[in-house]
């Protein structure tokens, strides 16, 4: 994971690094744990190494002098339902901050009603939800989509747990963090109010 910062400093796009370095590392850790080649403690240590690398990548993601952009607005990022895996949500938050969004990230195990209330109160322009293994996200998706409709925002989802989900019509499945990066470039407020 140390290579993540070095590659970013060489100009590699952060979304590509997350897709090509961090995500495969997480898959290897998860598969090794499922096959009993890693203990729970070892799986947690490996996952924490990825979390630390994502945290270190944040300053490298943000363009100098371009903090939150008023044309972007707020993005809410969470791992839905009982989902305990929030590393993809952390990577998503990092990318969205780099795109100029003010990011509110409750991350893991965010209850559906609390998530919807946060979307409404923050007037979120973009809601990015992830699920690695969970399957109890129908209520979160339904409520987040309803809240986003009221704020004029978009809802995007990703992760293996979302592949089988019944998505409301206005919710878009994204297969990669590159897709999120591209989606974020067109999301947000359409004009700045003075």
Question: Which residues fall in each region the model found?
Answer:
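Peripheral docking tails and interdomain loops at the edges
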Residues: 159-194
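Short phosphate-binding/catalytic loops that engage adenosine nucleotides
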Residues: 12, 100-102, 152
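A general structural motif
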Residues: 81, 85-87, 106-113
């Amino acid at each position: 994971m140390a290579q993540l910062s070095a590659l970013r400093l060489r100009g590699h796009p952060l979304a590509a690094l997350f897709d090509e370095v961090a995500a495969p590392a997480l898959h290897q850790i998860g598969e090794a744990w499922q096959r009993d080649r890693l203990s729970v403690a070892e799986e947690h240590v490996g996952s924490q190494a990825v979390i630390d690398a994502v945290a270190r990548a944040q300053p490298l993601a943000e363009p100098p002098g371009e903090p939150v952009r008023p044309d972007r607005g707020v993005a809410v990022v969470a791992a839905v339902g009982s989902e305990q895996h929030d590393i993809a949500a952390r990577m998503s938050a990092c990318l969205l901050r780099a795109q100029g969004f003010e990011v509110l990230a409750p991350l893991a195990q965010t209850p559906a009603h609390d998530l919807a209330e946060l979307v409404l109160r923050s007037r979120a322009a973009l809601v990015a939800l992830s699920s690695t293994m969970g399957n109890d996200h129908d209520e979160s998706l339904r409520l987040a989509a309803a809240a986003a409709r009221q704020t004029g925002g978009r809802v995007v989802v990703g992760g293996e747990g979302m592949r089988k989900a019944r998505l409301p019509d206005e919710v878009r499945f994204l297969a990669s963090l590159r897709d999120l990066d591209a989606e974020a470039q067109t999301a947000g407020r359409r004009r700045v109010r003075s």
